[in-house]
Curated annotation (Swiss-Prot):
Cofactor descriptive note: Binds 1 Mg(2+) ion per subunit. The magnesium is bound as Mg-PRPP.
Function: Catalyzes the conversion of uracil and 5-phospho-alpha-D-ribose 1-diphosphate (PRPP) to UMP and diphosphate.
Keyword hit for GTP-binding: yes
Top-level taxon in the UniProt lineage: Bacteria
Organism: Latilactobacillus sakei subsp. sakei (strain 23K) (Lactobacillus sakei subsp. sakei)
Catalysis: reaction(s): UMP + diphosphate = 5-phospho-alpha-D-ribose 1-diphosphate + uracil
Any one GO molecular-function label of the UniProt entry: magnesium ion binding
Notes on how activity is controlled: Allosterically activated by GTP.
PANTHER family the record matches: ADENINE PHOSPHORIBOSYLTRANSFERASE (PTHR32315), URACIL PHOSPHORIBOSYLTRANSFERASE, CHLOROPLASTIC (PTHR32315:SF4)
UniProt-annotated binding residues for 5-phospho-alpha-D-ribose 1-diphosphate: 79, 104, 131-139, 200
Protein name as catalogued: Uracil phosphoribosyltransferase
HAMAP family found in the cross-reference section: Upp_B
Transmembrane regions listed in the UniProt entry: none
Family matches, as NCBIfam families: PRK00129.1, upp
Amino acid sequence: MAKFTVLNHPLIQHKLTIIRNKNTGTKVFREVANEIAELMVYEITRDLAMEDVEVETPMGPAIEKQLSGKKLAVVPILRAGLGMVDGVLELIPAAKVGHIGMYRDEKTLQPHEYFVKLPTDIDQRQLFIVDPMLATGGSAIMAIDALKKRGATSMRLVVLVAAPEGVKAVQEAHPDVDIYAAGLDDGLNEEGYIYPGLGDAGDRLFGTK
């Protein structure tokens, strides 16, 4: 079964409170969402593989550490996932960026894929799939399906807020994909939105309704 982890770092929790607040405007919401994403990926990458390498310092040779595992990529689920990309790239500027476009039918709550654009070497990269909300889990499951179909084998799902229903659904569909969240909420309301949540993340990120 996939691991589910809530990252309880004080800075992450403080910033999550800011974006939950309905009075937080678009500019601050966007900035803080990226800050949370950066902090989350910092925590999540603690287990990246390392190797010894010899470097020449101004004073002489030294044996130091460098990354040795798979190259990294971030894959936002459009459109709201775009609001976490800059935070990840701030920490890992060499990461490539793929995109998966999804929209949710407001009546059936089912996701529909409309766009996929990925690095050509996706099978050689560790992917961070980013989306602010994990509600029913439908979009995340479909995104992971699409990535696996195209050769991806190493993925982690990174969300700001999750509902238990979505966590359970993703774990059952993809037990090999670990899930990381800044917050775990009570559940879904009758419309399928996370409660108490933070509202519509896409609208709050981009100033739309």
